């Protein structure tokens, strides 16, 4: 989840830096991924997705896939080693054993929930047809 959220936040922040509105930036990051790309990849496979998208998206995906892989490979290597050597388990046990664990966790989650990106997301999700209120 951290990798996915981190990538989404990075793209969102880049779009905002270049003048995109919060809702537009959210649509171009989270909505496109969760409402389209990941569902099609799960149903049909990444090879199908590559073969059936626009030529612009296709070319960009092919040209940038390797760069993204190389950018995150060291992070996955570090994470794997930290899981393997017990560092991550130790952190979890230490954090979860603190008497104020729940308050600290709630503060971390509130920071995310109250960020501009996820506040925009709440508004955008309300616009999805499945979330429209039914009239009596």
PLM regions with names:
Residues 9-12, 17-136:
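NAD(P)-dependent Rossmann-like dehydrogenase/reductase catalytic/cofactor-binding core
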Residues 1-2:
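A short glycine-threonine-serine/GTX helix/turn-capping micro-motif
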């Amino acid at each position: 989840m951290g990798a996915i959220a981190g990538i989404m936040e990075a793209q969102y922040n880049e779009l905002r830096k270049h003048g995109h509105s919060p809702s537009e930036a959210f649509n171009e990051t989270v909505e496109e991924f969760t409402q389209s790309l990941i569902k099609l990849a799960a149903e049909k496979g990444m090879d199908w997705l590559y073969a059936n998208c626009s030529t612009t998206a296709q070319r960009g995906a092919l040209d940038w896939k390797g760069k993204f892989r190389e950018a995150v490979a060291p992070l996955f290597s570090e994470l794997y080693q930290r899981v393997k050597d017990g560092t991550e388990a130790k952190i979890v046990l230490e954090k979860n054993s603190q008497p104020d664990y729940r308050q600290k966790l709630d503060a971390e989650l509130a920071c995310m929930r109250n960020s501009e990106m996820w506040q925009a997301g709440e508004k955008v999700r309300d616009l999805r047809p499945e979330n429209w209120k039914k009239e009596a």
